[in-house]
C-alpha cells in the first residue's frame, strides 16, 4: 500500500516522470503494456475494456463507454475508464484471460490478482450505476428533496426507500436488496420533506422510471426477495427495442419467454403496429417479455435468419423460450392486432401451441452428390432409415470451423458414395430444425446407425479423413463421445478472439 501511495504522489507531482502517460480519447484512458501498471497505481478505481478495432460489439459500446467516462470525470469521481487494444497488446490480453470482445474488467486499488468481471448492461447509465455500486454504499442517503430529485433524474430507473427509521428491519431488508442489484441506483431517506414531495405518508419503496407509467409503488411485506421480484417485474419497459445496448438486459433478465415483433421502422402504420404490440404486452407483464426489432437494420439480419425470416416477410411475430433448450413458436395468424397477439400468448401459456421447426425446401438434386443434403422435411426419413448408417454434419454457413471441414467432408462423401449402407450427409442447422436433435455448437457431427431404436452417436474424434473412416468402419465406436464432451471440445478449440462479428453476435444474443 505504501509503495502504491508513493507512486501516486510521484505521478501527480511530476508528470514528466511518468514515461508513458496514457493518452485520453473522449475521457477514456488509452492503455498499453508500457503504462498499464502505472495507470492501476495512479487510479484507485479503474474499469478497463479490452477490445478489438474490428469488433462490432466494441464499436457499438464505444459511445456509451465514452459517455460514462465523461459523466464520472465531470462529477470529480475517483473512478476512471480505460481501454486496451487487445489485438496490439496480446500479452495484457493473455494475462487477464481475454477470450472474446469486449471483455471489461474492474480493478480496485491496483489489485491485478482478481479484477472483477463487468456484467451489467452496455448503456452509459448501466456502466455508471454498476461502478458506483462497486465503490460506494448500496443506497445513497438522501437528506433532502433536491438529493432525491437528482437521484431520480440520474438514470432511466431508480429506486428510493422511504423509512422514518432507517435502522428498522424493513430498511435493512431494503439495503440487502440494494446490494444485490448492480445496475440501478438506490436511495434511502427518512426526511419528511422527501416523503411529502413524492406523496408518501408512511414507509414505502418506489421505483421511478422514465417510461410507461413513470413510477411503481411497492405493496406487500418488505423483504429482500419481495423487493427483488418487484424491481425485476417493473424495471423494463412494457415493450423494449432490441439493440446492442439493451441486449444484456433482455437476455440476462429473469423472464425467459420472449415474444419478438420484427418491425421495419420504415413500414406504414409503424406507430399503430407498435401500439397494438404494447397493448397486448399489458396482459403479460412479468410472464412474457415483449421485444421489437427493426428488421431493416443491418445488425439484426442474423437474428432474422435465426428465426427463418426474410426482410420481405416482416412485420412478423415469433416467440422463443430461453430455457435449457431454446424453442421457437409461430402464430397461426399473420394479423398483428392486439387481440391476435394476446390470444397467441394465452394459448402458449396454456400449452396449446406446438414448437415451430424451420425447414428449407428440399432441393431436387439433394441426393445426386456424394454428400447428401438434408433439410427439416427429409431428415427423419434419411437419418433414421433402419437400413442405413448415416453420418451427418450439422453446420452453419458462417462458421469458420465448418468451412475448414468442408473439403474433408466432401472427400468422405466420395469415399463412401457407392457404399451399400453408409450415407454421408450435411444439414444447415441455421435454416433447418428437427425435434429429435438439438445442436449447440458448429460443426456438430452425429452418427445414426442402421437400427429400429433411433440410436444417435456423437462423434468426438479427430476431424480428419482417417479419423472419420475409422469411426465408420468401427460401427461408430472409435471416436464416439457424448454431447457434453463435444461441447467442451468446441469451447476449447474455439478461437473466440478471431470470430467474425456475426458469429459472436449469434452466440451472445441467442
Curated annotation (Swiss-Prot):
- Residues forming the catalytic site: 55 (nucleophile), 58 (nucleophile), 399 (nucleophile), 402 (nucleophile)
Residues carrying the site annotation Contributes to redox potential value: 56-57, 400-401
Q: How would you describe the post-translational modification of this protein? A: Phosphorylation of Ser-359 by FAM20C is induced by endoplasmic reticulum stress and results in a functional switch from oxidoreductase to molecular chaperone. It also promotes interaction with ERN1.
Site note Lowers pKa of C-terminal Cys of first active site, residues: 122
Residue ranges of the Thioredoxin domain?
20-136, 351-477
E.C. number? 5.3.4.1
Q: Which GO terms describe its molecular function?
A: protein disulfide isomerase activity; protein heterodimerization activity
Name listed for the protein in its UniProt record: Protein disulfide-isomerase
Q: Which organism is it from?
A: Macaca fuscata fuscata (Japanese macaque)
Provide the taxonomic classification: Eukaryota, Metazoa, Chordata, Craniata, Vertebrata
Amino acid at each position: 500500500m505504501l509503495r502504491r501511495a508513493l507512486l501516486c504522489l510521484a505521478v501527480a507531482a511530476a508528470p514528466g516522470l511518468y514515461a508513458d502517460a496514457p493518452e485520453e480519447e473522449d475521457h477514456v484512458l488509452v492503455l498499453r503494456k508500457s503504462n498499464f501498471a502505472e495507470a492501476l497505481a495512479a487510479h484507485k478505481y479503474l474499469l478497463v475494456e479490452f477490445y478489438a478495432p474490428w469488433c462490432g460489439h466494441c464499436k457499438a459500446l464505444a459511445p456509451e463507454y465514452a459517455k460514462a467516462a465523461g459523466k464520472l470525470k465531470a462529477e470529480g469521481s475517483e473512478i476512471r475508464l480505460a481501454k486496451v487494444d487487445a489485438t496490439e497488446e496480446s500479452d495484457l490480453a493473455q494475462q487477464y484471460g481475454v477470450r472474446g470482445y469486449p471483455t471489461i474488467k474492474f480493478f480496485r486499488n491496483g489489485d491485478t490478482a482478481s479484477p472483477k468481471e463487468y456484467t451489467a448492461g452496455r448503456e452509459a447509465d448501466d456502466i455508471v450505476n454498476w461502478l458506483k455500486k462497486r465503490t460506494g454504499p448500496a443506497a445513497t442517503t438522501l437528506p433532502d428533496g433536491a438529493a432525491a430529485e437528482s437521484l431520480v433524474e440520474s438514470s432511466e430507473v431508480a429506486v428510493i426507500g422511504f423509512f422514518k427509521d432507517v435502522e428498522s428491519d424493513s430498511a435493512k431488508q431494503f439495503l440487502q436488496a440494494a446490494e444485490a442489484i448492480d445496475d440501478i441506483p438506490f436511495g434511502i431517506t427518512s426526511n419528511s420533506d422527501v416523503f411529502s414531495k413524492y406523496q408518501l405518508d408512511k414507509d414505502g419503496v418506489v421505483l421511478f422510471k422514465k417510461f410507461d407509467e413513470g413510477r411503481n409503488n411497492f405493496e406487500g411485506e418488505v423483504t429482500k426477495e419481495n423487493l427483488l421480484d418487484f424491481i425485476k417485474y417493473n424495471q423494463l419497459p412494457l415493450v423494449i427495442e432490441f439493440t446492442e445496448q439493451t441486449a444484456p438486459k433482455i437476455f440476462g433478465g429473469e423472464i425467459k419467454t420472449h415474444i419478438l415483433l420484427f418491425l421495419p421502422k420504415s413500414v406504414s402504420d409503424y406507430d399503430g403496429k407498435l401500439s397494438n404490440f404494447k397493448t397486448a404486452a399489458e396482459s403479460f407483464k412479468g410472464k412474457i417479455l415483449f421485444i421489437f426489432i427493426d428488421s431493416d437494420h443491418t445488425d439484426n439480419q442474423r437474428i432474422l435468419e435465426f428465426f427463418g425470416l426474410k426482410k420481405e416477410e416482416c412485420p412478423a411475430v415469433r416467440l422463443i423460450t430461453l430455457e435449457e433448450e431454446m424453442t421457437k413458436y409461430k402464430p397461426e395468424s399473420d394479423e398483428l392486432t392486439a387481440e391476435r397477439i394476446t390470444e397467441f400468448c394465452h394459448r402458449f401459456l396454456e400449452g396449446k401451441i406446438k414448437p415451430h421447426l424451420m425447414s428449407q425446401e428440399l432441393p431436387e438434386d439433394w441426393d445426386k452428390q456424394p454428400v447428401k443434403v438434408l433439410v427439416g422435411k427429409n431428415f427423419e426419413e434419411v437419418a433414421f432409415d433402419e437400413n442405413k448408417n448415416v453420418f451427418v454434419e450439422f453446420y452453419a454457413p458462417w462458421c469458420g470451423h465448418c468451412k475448414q471441414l468442408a473439403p474433408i467432408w466432401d472427400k468422405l462423401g466420395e469415399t463412401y458414395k457407392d457404399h451399400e449402407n453408409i450415407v454421408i450427409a450435411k444439414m444447415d442447422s441455421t435454416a433447418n430444425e428437427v425435434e429429435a436433435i438439438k445442436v449447440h455448437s458448429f460443426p456438430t457431427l452425429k452418427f445414426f446407425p442402421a437400427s429400429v431404436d433411433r440410436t444417435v452417436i456423437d462423434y468426438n474424434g479427430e476431424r480428419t479423413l482417417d479419423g472419420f473412416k475409422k469411426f465408420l468402419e468401427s460401427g461408430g465406436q472409435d471416436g464416439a463421445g457424448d454431447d457434453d464432451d463435444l461441447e467442451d471440445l468446441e469451447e476449447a478449440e474455439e478461437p473466440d478472439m478471431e470470430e467474425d462479428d456475426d458469429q459472436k453476435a449469434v452466440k451472445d444474443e441467442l
